[in-house]
Amino acid sequence: MVSSIFRHRTIFVLAAMLCSIISSARPSARASVAVVTDSITYSHASSAIEEYISSMRLDGKRGILLIDRWGVPDSLRAALKNLYEHESLEGAVLLGDIPVPMIRDAQHLSSAFKMNQQRDWKSSSVPSDRFYDDFNLEFRFLKRDADKPELFYYSLSEDSPQRIRSAIYTSRIKPADKAHKYELIDSFLRKAVKAKKDAAVINHVLFFAGHGYNSESMVARMAEYKALHEQFPTIETNGGKVDFINHDFDESVKDRLLAGLSEPSVDLAILHHHGYNDMQLLNGSPYVSSPDGWLSLARNYFRVKMRSSRNPDKLKADFINRYGIPAQWLEEASDPKFIAQDSLYSRSMDIYPEDVDAHSIAARFIIFDACFNGAFIEDDYIVSHYLFSDKNSTLAALAHSVNSLQDVWCDEMVGLFSEGVCAGNIYKNIWNLETHIFGDPTFHYSSLSSWDAAAGRGEYSDKFWRKAIASKEVHPDVKALAIRKLARRGSITPEELIDIQSNSSSEIVRLAAFDGNAEIAPDCFDKAILLALDDDYELLQRLGAKFASYNQSPTLAEKAVQLFLDPLTSKRVLFHIKSLFVTIDGEKAKSLVRSTPYWKGEDGKESLCRYIDSNTSSKKVDIDNLSSESIDLRSAKLFIRAQRNQCRADALDPIAEYYTRCSDPDIKLLIAETLGWYRYSYLAPHAQSLCQSLLEKESDPRLRAELTKSIRRISE
């Protein structure tokens, strides 16, 4: 172990020394971008790499070549940090076979990833380049993967900050096609250089909404359409437009969407849908209005179920008895004709890599608001097919290496593209653990402006950013950036943010102010939530409802009931309000229901009161189980784990009390980690106090570490 540690430290120093040797001697005040590549990739594509590095000067930046000769993440991180400290490093392009940090014990830094870490390490870790771009985060090396040696596992330390604050941006240029990867890298870099010479303005934005996304709320779609016009205010005056495609425009919308993405005028695409690493999931079962259509869908459903069953004979008998359907329908499952028919039908619902390869995608930047589309550790990932095709104009993309949350501000600061800011300097201020830029992070529309440097660097003063917020001429996304910068410095108060949220005429700025308070999570967060719940911007109201379900302050109860009973509450807002509604004290909830107008009338109210009674009873069973002498451990673990999403106020003390009596270290570890999720709760100070009390009495190093981490998560 000692020799291993010594060897890693030696590599650390060598990498730092190498940076000073290969760095350009130009003035360090000029922003630099490191192109990090392995020696084999460099030997195959050196001409294109050098040309790409040289092209940085077209943006007024310096390119720096850094060849990874060791293949160890710690060495590269040290080298990048050295460049940041001494060479004004702005970002890094990870080109070719660069080692992949696989992060564990940091699920709170992701938007949605909450997998049990006892499962396979490849599946239960997050591939994340935050290891390379956030120098404040501290990690412990765990091991190198035996099957995929490019994967290195790290645990986020309890001594580390528990929030992402990237100092630089990073991107991956990594073709999925291993047989032709060097040719593809060469071709892509030449495409990127050409684009720098021919930069064009952004005139045409296309966004898409897939099946099952955001509860298929059309209010959410309309609100996004309106918001994009605010984020790109000159787009129509310049002869451009914002277009929208919904999944239900066609039974199979794939061809329409691919054709839209291939329109030569499309500059930027925002794609909201579900996904896998090699699939973009677009359509579900179509809406049909004829008996023939219903029967066709039903027969397809039964055939698919039969084929996936482990006991088809039993399932066949069950279907016949339950639905009274002909046996012939079920026998079709093994008919080659129907197997081929169903396969083609299923294939028509979604986008696969070969579909992308068959088109000429025009969008130069694409946001993949989907799970796993950027899973670059897999043998194939669909983002690669958009980037590495001579026919495609795509130069950069934003995507996720694991699953991602639906209800986030996906279009956050995207309007900075129209203000002359490059992709990297936009998204380094936004991303989560799983978020990655793929392709050229220095990509931008039109020419870069002074806002690019302001977005990328930290030396701009509070006065500078406050002036931006106060200006009537400044773009709303620049104001959003200013709010983010000030909030992360602790240079703007919660009360100031509430004032902005109350008085700004811009829905983008109001949302940015609310988001700033969500980062701070102050005692007055419930006031910001109440303002959000009354806002006419659907996304702000929706995020207000989401955070309300975490906060659960009694001051939110009346508004929650009003929205829950209001026939005009939009579908996705209602989804989150229901999560808050079920946490309200049963008697109080019934009283509020009975005193609030409800479009379903008195019968509807009584039905709702019965639901409240049932829910109250169910909650009592779960909480009573924690104090029972004959505790159901399986139910207890499920209940505790559920609080990572629910953060129920009435569960906080019972969970902490159970920790003191529990003898199972794995359950205690789960509790210690769960308490940290109460960061947005109105009981957050109490949760922190409970963690501190448990820590003072705990001797197990692993549990002490997790409690320490939870204290940091709540307090930072």
Predicted regions and their residues:
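Bacterial Sec-dependent N-terminal signal peptides
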Residues: 1-29
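Structural detector for internal amphipathic alpha-helices that build alpha-solenoid repeat scaffolds
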Residues: 477-489, 508-520, 541-553, 572-584, ...
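Catalytic-core segments of thiol-dependent peptidases
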Residues: 84-103, 209-379
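Caspase-like cysteine protease fold
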Residues: 410-492, 498-499, 503-515
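Structured catalytic cores of large enzymes
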Residues: 74-251, 260-265, 277, 281-290
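Short inter-helical turns and helix N-cap capping residues of alpha-solenoid HEAT/ARM repeat scaffolds
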Residues: 474-475, 505-506, 536-538, 568-570, ...
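Catalytic cores of nucleophile-dependent amide-cleaving enzymes
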Residues: 124-188, 296-409
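Amphipathic alpha-helical scaffolding segments comprising HEAT/armadillo-like alpha-solenoid repeats
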Residues: 459-470, 490-501, 522-533, 553-565, ...
